Amino acid sequence: MFLRLIQRTLELGRRALVLVPEISLTPQMIRRLKSTFGSRLAVQHSALNNTERLLQWRMIQQGNADIVVGTRSAVFAPLQNLGLIIMDEEQEHTYQSESAPRFDAHDVAKKRAVMENALLLFASATPLTETYHAAESGKLQLVQLTHRYGGRPLPSVDFIDMRAELAAGNPREVSVRLARELQENLDNGEQSILLLNRRGYRTIGMCTTCGHVLKCPNCSVPLVYHKPQQALLCHHCGHTVHPLPQTCPECGGKISYSGFGTQRVEEELAELLPGARILELAELLPGARILRMDQDSTSRKDAHETMLAQFARHEYDILLGTQMVAKGLDFEKVTLVGVLGIDSLLFGQGFRAYESVFSLITQVVGRGGRAALPGRALIQTTVPDHPVLQLAAAQDYKGFYREEITFRRFSLYPPFCSFVVVGFIGDQEGAVFIAAQRFGALLGQHAAQKPNIPLRILGPAPMNITMLNNKFRYKLTLKCRNDAAFRALLHETLDAYDAEKLPQKASVILDFNSDGDL
């Protein structure tokens, strides 16, 4: 469908912009487009160095590119005569920038489409609830593909109850059945994908005597054990503790490391990347060639493209990774998908938690059985009867949407209101809290003079990560109608806050289309 739309756009003498949520998806997309449309194609994403980015930008600016492919920043590419914008996997949160300049690629794409009279396509098997609601309401045109590409059946999905595994004496993170089916795939010369959305080896270090948890001194989060470095690492600020602590800094008791991440599961499966062998589970999968793909293993330039090409050439049997392995990848020999550790996401914070889990499972399950061989998926969980997991296993998006839209309507969440977070960041926790409190009071006072503006002010409250990079963080959550009148109200309040003579102020950050945190 994408190729036909792009072909028609080029025939009309116009140009096309294709957005993808992850850098890892650009190589496959580029190969497909170049094989069909030739080399007049430019790329925009953060993995390019400054020289490469400038050359690609000039190529676009000078009119030498008919198609641009890239991640969210590509939405600003200076394409002239733009006729088509495709946002693939539009449900992904990576389309929203979390650092300055803050923007949502959805909003920028909509604005460009209107300004340039271009067609905008939001593509997804699991659209955002707001997007599908807009289509149901007639604000967007809904086009549904009722058959899987190539006419292949959907993979079969089974659940593995990890409570039963533990009761049966299996302490491993990989269940007996998953290990058995991985071995069957190895014997049959087929490939497997395993999803585990946690990096590192062990996810928490805790004292067995007093219960003290080893946390980052700069951020209010536990440090994560990374075995190759024999160190604890903060995934937010990069703080490192080396050598690995064995005794509690509070009471001198023994530190125990628990939980599991991709490094731990990789060790349980067989070998590390080429040149480093892991023996922990050689008895389970002797001879297995395992490729780990997460933020740690893909930090090198071109690592995504190199690793995916290696997997496509069947240099590896198992692709193990975080959520980057769930999206848009297409390997004909992948017949088994395993999902591990999904419960931590299922019970995560934010009103989009269920939506994220449903999308993630649906996407990763769809990576299997995409060619001649049928696919199957195994989901490890302690709550196999959870309705979100059951709906995801059945690939029942409409069923999930009905449940989700009912919850959103009852609880007044988007699309039935706009969700805006006003963040406050500073050096002194007390001062940050007072700043948030004062801003909320000012906003309430100004809003009281404009009763026609619907507004609910929640907070102040600490953010999910209260301290980040030695800065304390609090928030106000606003349920509102994000129109010109509301934005004018915010500007008035910001001006009034700026005029206040508080002893210590905090930086203020506005985050529109938020899921409830920064």
Region roles according to the model:
Residues 398, 433-458:
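Short amphipathic alpha-helix segments
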Residues 291, 446-463, 504-513:
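Short beta-strand elements
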